[in-house]
C-alpha cells in the first residue's frame, strides 16, 4: 500500500444522507462565492456538481472559469498530484479550488499503475486494453496476491491559500 502523506487520512466514506435540510448550513453569503474544480473531464464535473449540490454554490470547470493551463502532474503520490493541480488553478483565480487525483494501485505489480493510471500505456490507450494488460501481468497471481485498491485524493485550496486534503481507498481483488 502507498504510504499516506502527512495530513492525509485514509477513511471510510460516509454515504448516509443528512437527517436535516443542509441547504443554508454553509456560508451565509453564497451569491458571490464559487468553487472551481481543476478538471477538463465532463464526467468528473457532473459527479462533483452532484456531490456538492447541497452547498448552493456554482461549481465551475477550469474552462468555465476562464482558466487555461497545461498542468504537469509530476507528483509521486495522488496527494501531490491533486495539490499541484489545485494550487496551479488557485494561483490564477485566488478563489476556492478543488482538485482530485485517483487511480488503481495493484500490489502484485508494485502498485502500478498508481499515479500513472490515466497515462498507463499511453493516454490514448483504451481502458479495455489497459485492463487486459493488468490481468495478463497477474496471470500467476492467486488469491490475496491479486489485491488492489482504487485511491482518490481530493484537495481543496481555500481563498486564503490554506490546503485541505483527504484521501480514501476502496480495497479489493482483481478478478481473473
What would you call each of these model-derived segments?
Residues 28-36, 42-61, 66-176:
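Anionic-ligand binding patches
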Residues 10-26:
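Short, Lys/Arg-enriched N-terminal segments with co-localized hydrophobic residues
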Residues 4:
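Charged DNA-binding/catalytic regions of mobile-element recombinases
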Amino acid at each position: 500500500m502507498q504510504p499516506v502523506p502527512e495530513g492525509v487520512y485514509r477513511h471510510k466514506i460516509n454515504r448516509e444522507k443528512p437527517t436535516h435540510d443542509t441547504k443554508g448550513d454553509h456560508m451565509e453569503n453564497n451569491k458571490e462565492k464559487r468553487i472551481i474544480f481543476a478538471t477538463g473531464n465532463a464526467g468528473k464535473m457532473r459527479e462533483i456538481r452532484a456531490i456538492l449540490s447541497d452547498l448552493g454554490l456554482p461549481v465551475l470547470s477550469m474552462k468555465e472559469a476562464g482558466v487555461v493551463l497545461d498542468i504537469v502532474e509530476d507528483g509521486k503520490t495522488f496527494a501531490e498530484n491533486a495539490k499541484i493541480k489545485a494550487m496551479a488553478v488557485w494561483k490564477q483565480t485566488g478563489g476556492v479550488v478543488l482538485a482530485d487525483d485517483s487511480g488503481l494501485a495493484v500490489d502484485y505489480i508494485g502498485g502500478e499503475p498508481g499515479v500513472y493510471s490515466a497515462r498507463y500505456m499511453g493516454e490514448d490507450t483504451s481502458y479495455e486494453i489497459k485492463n487486459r494488460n493488468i490481468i495478463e501481468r497477474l496471470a500467476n497471481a492467486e488469491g490475496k496476491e491479486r489485491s488492489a485498491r482504487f485511491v482518490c485524493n481530493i484537495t481543496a485550496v481555500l481563498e486564503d491559500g490554506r490546503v485541505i486534503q483527504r484521501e480514501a481507498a476502496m480495497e479489493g481483488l482483481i478478478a481473473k
